[in-house]
Amino acid sequence: MENLSPIAEAIKYYKLNASGGYDEWSKVPRAPDYKMHVPSMDFDVEGHDEVREVIFGWLTDIGAQQELVNIVEFGASVTCYLHVTDKEGAVLDIVEVFQIDDQGRVNEIWAL
């Protein structure tokens, strides 16, 4: 994990402390109408409230534990490689791509 920009460091800090849920995520700078897509679950949400209710509700329901494997920054994108373990012990390899806007905030996220 090389030297990262402030927004990439904020994302990294959240991923290393993801057990703090939405409270930890809310410390990351985000555009007010940011979007998150999780194609495997058919989730397409927009804004703080929908992300909190849909995404973090789902993560809580499945008992998700996130392990940050690597984080890479390339231009206006930050990519996180994760192992996500659910309450039944199943481990998923997840790639999250964060698009950063020109104000240094998360503008869009894809969880693949």
Where are these regions (language model features)?
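Short acidic-aromatic low-complexity motifs
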Residues: M1-D33
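A beta-strand edge to alpha-helix "cap/lid" segment located at domain peripheries
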Residues: E2, H37, R52-L112
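Short histidine/acidic/glycine/proline-rich micro-motifs that form metal-
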Residues: L16, S40-F43, T85
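Generic, well-ordered alpha-helical segments
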Residues: F43-E50, A90
